[in-house]
Design a protein with these regions (language model features):
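Ribosome large-subunit tunnel/peptidyl-transferase-proximal elements
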Residues: 1-90
Length: 90
């Protein structure tokens, strides 16, 4: 690009892309851990992992990396599985 404003936009976009990758990557990692814990069947571990995953999803939504409805849907699905596990354990 030879236009000053476009050079600046490219620079900003790259910075934001890298920042967004961090938030989405963290959210993805913790959601995976929560799913693994839920599949494992250990209730305490599953509760803790789900709590951390929900926190990360909220953070990503707050930063604008995920849409808030997307984050809400993912949290809902995790909680649904956790509640099913708790019901099964009781």
């Amino acid at each position: 690009a030879n236009i000053k404003s476009q050079i600046k936009r490219n620079r900003q976009n790259e910075k934001r892309r890298l920042r967004n990758r961090v938030f989405s990557g963290r959210a993805r990692t913790y959601v995976k851990r929560a799913r693994t814990a839920l599949d494992g069947g250990n209730l305490d571990e599953a509760r803790l992992a789900t709590q951390v995953a929900i926190s990360e999803l909220d953070h990503a939504a707050e930063k604008g990396v995920l849409h808030r409805n997307n984050a809400a849907r993912r949290k809902s699905r995790l909680m649904k599985r956790l509640n099913a596990l708790e019901k099964q354990a009781a």
